[in-house]
Amino acid sequence: MINKFNYYFVTLLIFGNSVQKYRGTWASLFTVLFLFIIIYFLKISVFVVTILLLIILVYSYFAIASSLKNFKESDPQEIVIDEFVGQSIPIILFEIFHGDRNYSAYEALQIYFWFFLLFRVFDGLKPFPIDYVDKKFKNTFGILFDDILAGIYVVLCLSLIHI
């Protein structure tokens, strides 16, 4: 039962089987919209969202590890929880450090859109050290950490232009 839950968790249920192309992109877009809704419409505090994301990060590691035996590849495209984790990084850091500026929902959505675009660029191009992690670590750590690095690259890139 727990293995089935882990499988559904790491594939974000609907993206594992329903979406056949661009799973990572769809999962990243889902993440942006999900976080936007819970922060700007449901008004869940950034502290609570941060704790939730940390729990998801930790659980993702164990869920991916237990689910990998169900796949032939070492980094299967069906696993998209890593995109969720990586895409969450720039969003939650933005909210932690800039959330007090009272952005309108429209302004926040525009900013989140840039996070989405940049995350997909860094996740796709895999600049160093993302490419190194992606090639060197064909395991749970590699699956998660390359997307974490892509999220960090988004933060670094936008920090340079002072968003």
Regions found by a protein language model. Give the residues of each.
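Internal alpha-helical transmembrane segments of multi-pass membrane proteins
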Residues: 46-50, 76-80, 101-116
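Hydrophobic alpha-helical transmembrane segments
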Residues: 25-30, 50-54, 109, 113-117, ...
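Interhelical loop and helix-boundary elements at the membrane-water interface
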Residues: 1-27, 62-89, 120-152
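Interfacial segments of multi-pass membrane proteins
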Residues: 30-42, 91-95, 138
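Alpha-helical transmembrane segments of multi-pass membrane proteins
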Residues: 36, 53-61, 86, 95, ...
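C-terminal halves and exits of single transmembrane alpha-helices
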Residues: 89-104
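Conserved small/polar residues in nucleotide/adenosyl-binding loops
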Residues: 161-163
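N-terminal leader/targeting helix
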Residues: 38-68
